[in-house]
Amino acid sequence: MELHITPALALLCEHHLLDHVSNLTDFTATSVSYDSRKVKSGTLFFCKGNFLPKYLASAKEKGAIAYVAEKEYPEGEGLPAIIVNDEQKAMSLLGAAFYDYPQNDLFIIAITGTKGKTTTAYFADHILAQSTANHIALFSTLDRILGNKPEDEFKSDLTTPESLDLFHDMRAAVDNGMTHLVMEVSSQAYKKNRIYGLKYDVGIFLNISPDHIGRNEHPTFADYLHCKEQLLVNSAKCLINAETEKFTDVYYTAKATTQPEDIFLFARRGANIELPDNAQIDFEYRNDLEDLHESEFELTALTEKAKQLNLDGRYKTSVPGDYNEGNAVAAIIASGLAGASANDAVETLNHVHIRGRMEMINSNTHGTIYVDYAHNYASLKRLLAFLKRQTNAGKVTVVLGATGDKGISRRPGFGKALTEEQPDEVILTTDDPGFEDPMTIAREIDSYIDHDKVKHIQFEMDRETAIKKAIDGSGNDDIVVLAGKGEDPYQKINGEDVPYLTDVKIARDYINDLER
């Protein structure tokens, strides 16, 4: 891979990003990086994010051939300086060019929503693995899968990677023979222009509810919604859950750049929805069976364009939760738009396992433990409401915390969900506190709980101890809900990723010790 200065500057000019160039020479970059630790001879270096001038000095010392920034730095003296008005946009465009536009060789399904992105991504990944003979790549909150060999699978650091990493991984997927890609897209990816210029074949909008609002994230819900909607603006075909909040806004955003015949709407049968203009529900689904182990539903095409996909039928998923049926429907339709058949979905959906999503751990003497990534008001409420409907549990204990430095709106949201669903006991603990004091976060959550409705609340800042306390206090017919972290293998504390065994492993190991 390489990038010559002349087409690079032309590309920046085309997007009105280039301010000026200092010390211009004729060069070809043979690598690109925003991390000075990874710079080698011939690298085009990007000064991004939490940049410090010393990083540029280090990059220069290691052989950087030029740098891209929003201003010139003395530390880069003697190097060609490509000065732009938006470094993140420039990095995305030049990253795509350096890796020779791998997105053009992939059918890309992109998914956004406040909740359900990962579950939908895994459903679609399994369906398309069946229909493409495993020529499918996956970029999710949990994993980045670039091929079919063990060395092609990595743990994810971000829901949507930095642009250079994203295009690097796309290139690797294409070189590994992948023809399709399913990827989650976060609102932050648009807020920070990580995916500027990237287009999708199918864009899925699952839902929207207040989240990621506060310092270091989105200043308002309107800003959060706007960033989510950008996925539809950049998609050739749009698939929208018509039951989402702000549906009219979302629909009009899609319609502004997409022809009506390329917009597909789905909803649960009987849902109370006000449809704008001449919009029609294209697919409806009806729940036929739900329990703690699986869900079964019927999908019906209502419009001519929907009927052409031949996706009518009954489907069964191994991921419980009535709310996950909508995620499965989105995956079925999107996969159908990518060429998959109804049979591909029927054969695969009942075999999908997603780590840390409604993961159930049984015990002989301490009830049932559920591990779920529920990390905001909407997802926690839906999880607790579902478990309440599906079980005759004696006591329900919830273990949770809230992240520090971001997502401040989650704290009142947790208090509201707990008040409304009224578990018998709550243990407030640590969950990625960042630079905040976890006890302060826990007490803030507690301040939003109605103590007349939730009477038993404990504080235990060691999460492993909190989990063990919850299990110790539970009997045969009881339920323990470990919410918020799912399969996260670390705690973010004071700027470091501190290794953490994961909620699943801690609970399983402790149950095994107790029942030995």
Predicted regions mapped to residue ranges:
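Short, polar loop motifs at secondary-structure junctions
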Residues: 65-75, 140-143, 243-245, 267-271, ...
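ATP-dependent carboxylate-amine ligase
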Residues: 1-17, 41-44, 49-52, 334-343, ...
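Structural beta-sheet core signal
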Residues: 138, 183, 203, 240, ...
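N-terminal leader/targeting and accessory segments in enzymes
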Residues: 1-93, 97, 316, 320, ...
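Phosphate-binding loop of NTP-binding sites
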Residues: 91-242, 246-261, 391, 515
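Acidic, Mg2+-coordinating active-site environments of NTP-dependent enzymes
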Residues: 75-77, 202-369, 447-450
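Short loop/helix-cap segments at secondary-structure boundaries that form the rim of catalytic
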Residues: 39, 59, 71-79, 147-149, ...
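Non-catalytic positions within long, well-ordered alpha-helices that form the structural scaffold/packing
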Residues: 60-61, 174, 196, 419
